[in-house]
Amino acid sequence: MQVQKSFKDKKTSGTLYLVPTPIGNLQDMTFRAVATLKEVDFICAEDTRNTGLLLKHFDIATKQISFHEHNAYEKIPDLIDLLISGRSLAQVSDAGMPSISDPGHDLVKAAIDSDIAVVALPGASAGITALIASGLAPQPHVFYGFLPRKAGQQKAFFEDKHHYPETQMFYESPYRIKDTLTNMLACYGDRQVVLVRELTKLFEEYQRGSISEILSYLEETPLKGECLLIVAGAQADSEVELTADVDLVSLVQKEIQAGAKPNQAIKTIAKAYQVNRQELYQQFHDL
């Protein structure tokens, strides 16, 4: 067992500070974050060029150490040695909260294993910021980070998670979002989602609707900018609601465009919308 008193204990080593940075709007940088970055001995940055611009804006002269997923394994022992010697470090990511979809967690774990105090500062976090304005249930929720890129792995992921009642959050590339939503539709049915782009920036946008509605919108309005996908959790004994606005043939065609064979696409959409597969087959082939 370990008990950490972050500010009251007499320190025999330095402290590791986890400092959030703005996710798009520099006005979201906190006074405490600026003060901490000025006071520590070194700043561990995911991208020193990107963080350098932030430091320059707030007149912070603290030296940076490059720390990212490709060098974390070799850097962590040296960083722990610095902390043990009494130096304090701040870890930042390119945007948002450290340790969320970056290598910060491994550094935190190593510090805790060495009885080094770890102090997290509150601040910007894309997932929570988007969730509370999404209109979907804020709790319970689960954040998964980035999705698998390959269609087969992604569908397997969705099949495993489709029955979860929690609101789900994902990061996704704007270039893959249509394929991702198509795969999700096949596994989750046409449930409610919120697609958020350019959070806290000038072109911030929330697209709220069913998966099929968002897909139709994206056909006419290509997505640009960083985005986050929030999905309603599964409802007990829920059934997909089929309305006149849902074009099942178009959904089958989108499945085919995503790489599915026609019969498999028909089977997927029929299952998602709980319609007769043979009837959808005849409708698709205009029999």
Swiss-Prot record:
Gene3D superfamilies assigned to the protein according to its UniProt record, in alphabetical order: Cobalt-precorrin-4 Transmethylase, Domain 1, Methyltransferase, Cobalt-precorrin-4 Transmethylase, Domain 2
InterPro entries noted in UniProt: 4pyrrol_Mease (IPR000878), 4pyrrol_Methylase_sf (IPR035996), 4pyrrole_Mease_sub1 (IPR014777), 4pyrrole_Mease_sub2 (IPR014776), rRNA_ssu_MeTfrase_I (IPR008189), SAM_MeTrfase_RsmI_CS (IPR018063)
Enzyme Commission number(s) from the entry: 2.1.1.198
Subcellular location: Cytoplasm
Keyword DNA-binding set for record: no
Lineage: superkingdom: Bacteria
Catalysed reactions, semicolon-separated: cytidine(1402) in 16S rRNA + S-adenosyl-L-methionine = 2'-O-methylcytidine(1402) in 16S rRNA + S-adenosyl-L-homocysteine + H(+)
Keywords from the named record: Cytoplasm, Methyltransferase, rRNA processing, S-adenosyl-L-methionine, Transferase
Any one annotated GO CC term: cytoplasm
Function statement: Catalyzes the 2'-O-methylation of the ribose of cytidine 1402 (C1402) in 16S rRNA.
Family membership: Belongs to the methyltransferase superfamily. RsmI family.
Protein name as catalogued: Ribosomal RNA small subunit methyltransferase I
Organism whose genome encodes this protein: Streptococcus pyogenes serotype M1
Gene for this chain: rsmI
